[in-house]
């Protein structure tokens, strides 16, 4: 009888679903092949409206699961909003779920229940936030105004300022975009706005690229914005790209180009408001708050990084300090994420770029795919945890993005045990240096492997 009911459900293509991504047109989502109209629920969502608007008009199966690890209540509540079934997919579909992730989530729930801890709050979170805001403001003042006449000292202080920008991004912005700081959506919203304000980069852009794109389709070419989809790129990191002679040297030049990341980000983030996509990932509709935050953030950036400092420094000196700070900021962030996903032992797959083709299915459960495309490093090092903002435990983060980085170390043994039980290899490097070397070796091998043969998407 249940199968008969399923046969007669109304069918919707992904393009039809994509039109329902605003409150005016209705908020539709698809989960596990079923379509839900959650327009009436949006104002009652404990996580706020904007999180659902970010997810609207698309398949959110894996986001839904990974952002509700502590309770099954949302799954039970959804049934009343069901309106039909998905007929076509926009992006790859993961194979049917194994028991791996459900077992893992159950163990994590037990851990927090026994320890009586809140997965989104700890006093350590408050201490870290106070520190990163203080460090950012103090390092800005000292690097721009404290030693005006000392060129070489200011060059060194520019590097210190880049560190404060990096820690601010990794400790505050990264957790806020994943709803991993407090249970209050207003906290996430305003913390995100301070990223626009203090860093001059769009929090809304990051949420679309990182949360909607990268976390769902990790290391899937033509879906994950972090590995690109253009035929010609400054590096080759997948076997689905054409190979050019310059790539033989990418292990030498690519790390330096990573230093341009922060500048590129600030120059390109406006596209989230104008182009409607980041790579192949459709972007959500921005609220007035997000647009205003973006505009004010850019103005504040120009005033505080250029106009005011120019009253104290020559243009040449100021640009020197600026590019030093931005170069090291770009390096810090880029390597923080690149070493976690681009290495020889990590999986890379691809999906079709042809709109008329059905996307290639991924031959793995989503959670297992996350483990096979990601590696951790320095799992017992508090220094690695602090200076990476928790991304040294990237496997933990991808499986439980809405849990605060404060608890990542506690979850590692749980994940290792469940991986052993299900015979899933957990990729761990002993140190950051080992992870860094694995990434450089990967760049070298991708550029110099004589047996390289471009794979087709269907391989």
Curated annotation (Swiss-Prot):
GO CC term (a single one): membrane
Motif (Histidine box-3): 394-398
Keywords from the named record: Electron transport, Fatty acid biosynthesis, Fatty acid metabolism, Heme, Iron, Lipid biosynthesis, Lipid metabolism, Membrane, Metal-binding, Oxidoreductase, Transmembrane, Transmembrane helix, Transport
Topology of this chain in the membrane: Multi-pass membrane protein
Motif Histidine box-2 mapped to chain: 210-215
Keyword check for Ligase: no
Cytoplasm among keywords: no
Gene3D superfamilies (UniProt xref): Cytochrome b5-like heme/steroid binding domain
Location(s), subcellular: Membrane
GO molecular function (one): metal ion binding
Single GO BP term: lipid metabolic process
Residues at which heme binds: 45, 68
E.C. code: 1.14.19.-
Transmembrane segments: 121-141, 151-171, 187-207, 289-309, 315-335
Short sequence motif Histidine box-1: positions: 174-178
InterPro entries associated with the record: Cyt_B5-like_heme/steroid-bd, Cyt_B5-like_heme/steroid_sf, Cyt_B5_heme-BS, FA_desaturase_dom, Fatty_acid_desaturase
Main localization category: membrane
Cofactor: Fe cation
Similarity remark: Belongs to the fatty acid desaturase type 1 family.
Entry note about domains: The histidine box domains may contain the active site and/or be involved in metal ion binding.
Official protein name in the record: Probable Delta(5) fatty acid desaturase C
UniProt organism field: Dictyostelium discoideum (Social amoeba)
């Amino acid at each position: 009888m249940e199968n008969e009911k399923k046969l007669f459900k109304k069918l919707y293509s992904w393009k039809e679903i994509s039109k329902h991504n605003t409150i005016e047109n209705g908020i539709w989502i698809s989960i596990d092949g079923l379509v839900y109209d959650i327009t009436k629920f949006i104002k009652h969502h404990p996580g706020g409206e904007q999180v659902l608007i970010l997810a609207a008009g698309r398949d959110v199966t894996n986001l839904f699961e990974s952002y509700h690890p502590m309770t099954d209540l949302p799954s039970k509540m959804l049934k009343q909003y069901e309106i039909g079934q998905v007929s076509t997919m926009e992006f790859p579909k993961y194979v049917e779920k194994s028991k791996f992730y459900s077992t893992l989530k159950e163990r994590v729930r037990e851990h927090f229940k026994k320890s009586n801890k809140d997965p989104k709050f700890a006093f350590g979170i408050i201490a870290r936030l106070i520190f990163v805001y203080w460090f950012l403001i103090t390092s800005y003042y000292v690097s721009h105004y404290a030693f005006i006449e000392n060129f070489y000292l200011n060059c060194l202080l520019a590097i210190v300022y880049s560190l404060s920008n990096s820690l601010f991004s990794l400790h505050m912005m990264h957790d806020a975009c994943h709803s991993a700081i407090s249970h209050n959506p207003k906290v996430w919203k305003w913390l995100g706005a301070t990223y626009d304000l203090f860093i001059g980069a769009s929090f809304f852009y990051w949420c679309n690229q990182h949360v909607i794109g990268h976390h769902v389709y990790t290391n899937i070419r033509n879906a994950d914005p972090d590995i690109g989809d253009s035929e010609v790129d400054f590096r080759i990191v997948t076997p689905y790209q054409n190979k050019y002679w310059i790539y033989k040297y990418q292990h030498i030049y690519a790390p330096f180009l990573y230093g341009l990341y922060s500048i590129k980000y600030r120059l390109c983030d406006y596209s989230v408001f104008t182009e409607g996509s980041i790579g192949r990932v459709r972007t959500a509709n921005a609220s007035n708050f997000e647009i205003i935050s973006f505009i004010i953030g850019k103005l504040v950036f120009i005033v505080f990084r250029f106009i005011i400092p120019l009253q104290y420094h020559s243009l040449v000196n100021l640009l020197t300090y600026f590019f030093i700070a931005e170069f090291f900021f770009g390096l810090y962030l880029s390597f923080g994420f690149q070493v976690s996903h681009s290495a020889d032992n990590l999986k890379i797959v691809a999906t079709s770029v042809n709109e008329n083709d059905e996307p290639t299915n991924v031959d793995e459960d989503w959670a297992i795919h996350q483990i096979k495309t990601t590696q951790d490093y320095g799992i017992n090092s508090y220094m690695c945890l602090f200076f990476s903002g928790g991304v040294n435990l990237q496997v933990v983060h991808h499986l439980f993005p809405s849990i605060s980085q404060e608890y990542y170390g506690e979850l590692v043994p749980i994940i290792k045990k469940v991986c052993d039980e299900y015979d899933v290899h957990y990729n761990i490097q002993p140190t950051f240096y080992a992870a860094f070397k694995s990434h450089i070796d990967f760049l070298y091998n991708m550029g110099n492997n004589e047996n390289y043969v471009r794979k087709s998407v269907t391989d």
